[in-house]
Design a protein with these regions (language model features):
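Catalytic nucleophile-loop/oxyanion-hole region of alpha/beta-hydrolase
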Residues: 57-89
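Gly/Ala-rich beta-loop-alpha elbow adjacent to hydrolase catalytic centers
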Residues: 96-101, 105
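Hydrolase active-site cap/lid region
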Residues: 111-170
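Conserved alpha/beta-hydrolase "acid-adjacent" motif
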Residues: 197-203
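Catalytic histidine-centered segment of alpha/beta-hydrolase-like enzymes
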Residues: 222-236
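Short beta-strand immediately N-terminal to the catalytic nucleophile in serine-hydrolase-like folds
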Residues: 92-97, 124, 191
């Protein structure tokens, strides 16, 4: 994947650079610019930020099939980004993920060979339950329920990849996190607007109810992944305080 770095400010009021890096993962259809919203928080904490691209996002090289994997495939690119951080001075990392980037980040924490280096996750408007999200958009677009069910089957069935163009089927249950709350192993902060009409907030709230490692902070009045735009001071303060407390705690195990 391609990436750009933002180092902590080199002025006397800034904190000493941390050996914890922030790995920023944008959402579907967005670019690395989406992740710049987190810079006030990471700069305040002295974190180096790596703003990465991933397969098929129009900045990184495309995969063989040229298709998004909804987090099922892209996590491998985050693992490579963590490799880079660990070989350039980082001892551990915090994953930031917006929208589908949230799904990618959770898959990374679950599957990556570098997962032990992940201290925490900060997710903004994350897509956490793809089964529910597909049905939601089926209803939103006034399509028959069977259309959504067919879409799920086409994406997930090995025999139908020739119709979808996917190199491999996507196991949607594996990336529907309220069904896998017990598999959350890292402290996770979720910021999600209750007025998000593209990726509804309910799975985020539900995951926080099901996992003691997940903290959910609702926003109001913001469209999808625009929580920072509505109230940048609250967003930055929430993330900074939460990460300060989390990074001061013990290193997660497993």
């Amino acid at each position: 994947p391609d990436a750009s770095l933002t180092h902590p400010q080199a002025d006397q009021d800034a904190p000493r650079p941390s050996t914890t890096w922030a790995i920023m993962v944008h959402g579907m259809g967005a670019t690395r610019a989406e992740t710049l919203r987190a810079l006030d928080a990471t700069q305040a904490l002295g974190l180096t930020s790596l703003h990465m691209s991933y397969r098929n996002d129009r900045e990184a090289p495309a995969s063989e099939d040229g298709r998004y994997g909804l987090g099922f495939t892209e996590w491998r690119d985050v693992d490579v980004a963590i490799d880079y951080a660990l070989t350039h001075g980082a001892r551990d990392v915090v994953l930031f993920g917006w929208s589908m980037g949230g799904s990618i980040s959770l898959q990374t924490a679950d599957l990556a060979r570098n997962r032990r280096a992940i201290r925490a996750l900060v997710l903004d408007g994350p897509a956490l339950d793809w089964l529910e999200l597909i049905q939601y958009h089926t209803h939103l677009n006034k399509l028959p329920l069977t259309i959504g069910q067919l879409g799920v089957k086409m994406i997930s069935h090995p025999a139908l990849t020739s119709f979808t163009g996917l190199k491999e089927p996507i196991n949607l249950t594996r990336i529907s996190w309220p069904h896998r709350a017990d598999d959350i192993t890292r402290p996770t902060l979720i910021l999600h607007s209750t007025d998000d009409l593209f990726v509804p907030y309910q799975p985020s709230a539900r995951l926080a109810e099901l996992s003691p490692l997940v903290d959910f902070v609702p926003f109001t009045g913001a469209s999808h992944t625009r929580e920072w735009n509505i109230d940048p001071e609250r967003w930055t303060t929430t993330v900074t305080r939460w990460l300060t407390d989390t990074l001061a705690g013990p290193q997660p195990q497993g």
